[in-house]
């Protein structure tokens, strides 16, 4: 993407005002909107709110949201009330909290009608229908949500900072004089399978932005993640494998992979063309793009030094 994300979105602010409206405007004065009590249903919803400096008064699956964040500033605090599971939140508790707005992931819409009976609902649609271009859609959705919360200037600065960071990473990658194809994966604990992130994913969009070729070019429906057997990596000998490393699953997966003859014989394994990256949420918002851009660039710099 050669042009600035922020520049491409100047016209979207006007559209966002019409399409999303100011959901809270009916509640009263601007001061009230600025102090809106917001609840989040879905990990992406919580991630996007936190990225805008908005701490939800209540959120579903707080533990999972915090586990997926490596930045303490992007974690839900203790005084954020737990609402339970994303697909079965505690509606009675949510009603008692009387939020001004409920932000919900587009992948958790089964209860949207019930939520609308409690408070206005903002549907965050980064990975839902029609799918595709999650990086671009995340910028759009952040600005529309910010418009609803009357924090437009803050959101514009945030989007601009993400854009600037990706531009900086692109310059570093370009200076390397060529990079390998990259495969971003989540290892399975069974030591036989892995998830790959191809087109229609935030990780692929970041690769495109940094001019890095994704080794996985297979079909990837929006919002889905293909699963491969490790034997399929045999056809990717010149690929740099980036696996998400977390303290819960990665050690078990690596232990089981170490005992696999198939794994040990893979060219990319024999040549040491694999590297861990800190845990991240692949279906997050711009924070995911920001984090993966940095991790991808760092991994490519290290690869170039030892290649």
Name these PLM-found stretches.
Residues 2-4, 10-30:
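N-terminal export signals
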Residues 37, 43-97:
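A short, structured surface patch at a secondary-structure boundary
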Residues 110, 124-144, 177-204, 249-252:
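Extracytoplasmic ligand-binding site segments that recognize negatively charged/polar headgroups
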Residues 36-37, 140, 240-307:
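Structured C-terminal subdomain patch of bacterial secreted/periplasmic proteins
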Residues 60-61, 200-223:
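His/Asp/Glu-enriched short active-site or ligand-binding loop at hydrolase and phosphoryl-transfer sites
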Residues 98-104, 237-239:
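Proline-aspartate-enriched helix->loop->beta-strand connector
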Residues 37-52, 153-210:
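Basic- and aromatic-lined ligand-binding clefts that recognize polyanionic substrates
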Residues 5, 25-40, 44:
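C-terminal segment of N-terminal export signals and the immediately downstream linker at the start
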